[in-house]
A protein has these predicted regions:
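Mixed-charge, Lys/Arg-enriched low-complexity segments
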Residues: 52-91
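Acidic-enriched, low-complexity/disordered segments with a strong bias for Aspartate over Glutamate
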Residues: 7-8, 26, 42, 60, ...
């Protein structure tokens, strides 16, 4: 089950586990992106997180809306299916 909170941010949408690219570090380490959650803190901005297979955030990008987050990933990757996290309605 996908977490409702990541890095103290509320999860609004997420993807199924997949291969969404990788991040290469200067020290030679490679981390693979397995999840793409869209989250928010208490402000009105939204973050597109890149998470590893342990749901750890390894990169984030700030946008003004959920739609901007989705459009950014939909342009760079084909056929992303976004899953709405209905659990956030209890907060």
């Amino acid at each position: 089950m996908f977490p409702n909170i990541l890095d103290d941010a509320l999860v609004h949408f997420y993807t199924q586990k997949g291969n969404y690219g990788s991040i290469y570090y200067d020290n030679g380490k490679i981390e693979y992106i397995h999840y793409l959650p869209i989250c928010s803190y208490d402000n009105k901005e939204y973050y597109l997180f890149h998470c590893n297979n342990k749901f750890e955030v390894i990169a984030d990008y700030l946008f003004d809306s959920i739609e901007e987050c989705m459009n950014m990933e939909n342009r760079s990757k084909k056929e992303i299916v976004w899953i709405k996290n209905n659990c956030n309605e209890i907060y």
